[in-house]
UniProtKB/Swiss-Prot annotation:
Protein known as: Chromosomal replication initiator protein DnaA
Organism: Nitratidesulfovibrio vulgaris (strain ATCC 29579 / DSM 644 / CCUG 34227 / NCIMB 8303 / VKM B-1760 / Hildenborough)
Chain's gene name: dnaA
Keyword entries, A-Z: ATP-binding, Cytoplasm, DNA replication, DNA-binding, Lipid-binding, Nucleotide-binding
Classification via Pfam families: Bac_DnaA, Bac_DnaA_C, DnaA_N
One GO molecular-function entry: ATP hydrolysis activity
UniProt keyword DNA-binding, yes or no: yes
GO biological process, one term: regulation of DNA replication
Domain note: Domain I is involved in oligomerization and binding regulators, domain II is flexibile and of varying length in different bacteria, domain III forms the AAA+ region, while domain IV binds dsDNA.
Start and end residues of each stretch annotated as Domain II: 68-146
Function statement: Plays an essential role in the initiation and regulation of chromosomal replication. ATP-DnaA binds to the origin of replication (oriC) to initiate formation of the DNA replication initiation complex once per cell cycle. Binds the DnaA box (a 9 base pair repeat at the origin) and separates the double-stranded (ds)DNA. Forms a right-handed helical filament on oriC DNA; dsDNA binds to the exterior of the filament while single-stranded (ss)DNA is stabiized in the filament's interior.
Region (Domain III, AAA+ region), start-end ranges: 147-364
SMART domains assigned to the protein according to its UniProt record, in alphabetical order: AAA (SM00382), Bac_DnaA_C (SM00760)
Region (Domain I, interacts with DnaA modulators): 1-68
Region (Domain IV, binds dsDNA): 365-491
Amino acid sequence: MTSIWGQIQHILQNTLAPGLFKVWISPLAGEVDGSTLRVEAPNEFVAGWVRDRLFEDIRTAACGVIGDTVEVVVTAGAPAAAAPRPVLAPRPAVVEVVPTAAPVPSVVPAVEARPSGHAPRRLSAETQQAQEQLGLPLDWAPVPQSRTNWRFSFDDFIVGPNNELACAAARGMCRDGLMTDTLFLSSGPGLGKTHLLHAVGRSLCESSNRSNPNVAYLTAEEFASRLIAALKARDVERFKARYRDVDVLLLEDVHFLQGKEKMQDEVLATVKALQSRGSRIVFSSSFAARDLKNVDNQLVSRFCSGFLAGIERPDFDTRRRILREKARIYQVMLPDNVTDLLAERISTDVRQIESCLHNLILKAKLLNRQISLEMAFEIIGNYAQAETQLDFEGIVRMVCEGFGLSPEQLNSRSRKREYVVARNAAYLLARKHTDLSLKEIGDRFNRRHSTVLKGITALEREMNRETPLGRQVANTISLLERNGRITHARH
C-alpha cells in the first residue's frame, strides 16, 4: 500500500512542473507524526529552497491526504559521511529523472577516464565542494543511461493533424529515415515537445546495441547552470568533453539562450562538434527558429540545418482521444458527455487537459463518488475555455481591467514595473489566443517584434520558475482568461 508521503508525492508529481518535482521533491523524505508532516531534505540548501518556494504546494497536497489541520515542517538531514564522490566513466550517459518502476541494473565506476599511461584520478576536493555548495540543480555527476527513466514514448503519443509531421520526424530520427541528423521542434507550451524528446530518447536507448547508450537530455537552462558550475569548479574541460562526445543530444527550450552570448558560444561549439562526428541532435523551442532574437546567426543556422517541425493546437477530435487514452491509463471510466465537455472547453494546452482530468479523478476518489457531468463542471471552472477565441481588443480590455490600468497607460512608453508586467501579459495572451504574429502584436502596441518576444520569454520564465511574481502573474492571467472567455462568450 502506498505510504502517506508516497500519496503526497504522487499529487505533487501531477501538479508541479516535471523539472521542479525531479530536482526538489524526489530527494525529500517524508514522515507523518500525528497531524504533522516532517519533510527531510538532503542538505540545508535544498531545505531552504523548498521552504521558500514549494512549502505551500507541499502543504496543499498534504491537506488533500491528511486533512486541513496538517502542519508541515521542513528540515535538513545530517551531512552524509565523506565517501568518495562518483566521477566520470568513459563516455558517460546523461540523465532524465522521473522515478518509475524500471530496474536499475548498473553503477558508474568511481574513477574518471584518463588518457593511456595515466593513473585514474578522483575529483579534486575543490570540485566536490563547489558542486555540493551549488546545490542539486547544478550537480552534474553522471548517471548510467540504464538508470534513465524516460517518462513518455511514441506509443502513448496521440497523433492528430496538429502534430503528425513532428511525430513522423521524431520517429524518423530514431530509424535513420529523416536523412538528417538534426531536428528542431517548436510549439507553444503544453503541446508535446517534451513528450517527443522523451520518446526519441527512449526509442534510441531501447534500440541501441550498447548496454550504456550515450544520450544526453537536458534543458538549455540546465546546460547553462552546469556550465556555470563547471566554471566555478574550474573544471570546464571535463564539462566540454562530456557533452561533445555523446551520440545523441536532446536539448529543450533553446529560446532560453536569447541574449546569452557566452552560453550561445558554448552551445554552438558543442553542436559543431556533434554534427562533425555524426551525432543526432533534437532541439525544442517555444518559438520557431526564425523568431529567435539576440541569438548568434551561426547558431540559428545550425538550428535550421536539419528538419524544422512545428506543433499546433490539437483539434476537438484529438483532444477527445487524448482524454480517453489518459482515462485508460488511470483505469477509470470517463462518461462520453464528460469527455466531450473537457475536450470542448479546454482547447489550447494538452497539459491543461491532462491536469483537469487528473484533478477530476482525484476529486472523485477523495469524495468516493462517481465521475459525473456536474462534478466536471465544478472542476472545469479552474480551466474554463469558451468555444470562441478572444480577439485582440478583448484581451487589451481585460488586461487593463485586471491590472487596473487604462489603455493609454498599457500602451505608453513607461517602464514602470506594473506597466511592463501588464504589457508582457497582454503580449502572452495575444500570442496564445489570437492568430496574430509577433510582428503584428508589436505593431498594435507600437513595439518592435523583438520587444514582444523578450516580454513573453521573461514572463514565461517567471511563471515556470514559480517565483512570487510568476505565481501572481500566472494566477492573474488564469483569472483573466477564465473571466474574459466567459464574458466574451456571453456577448
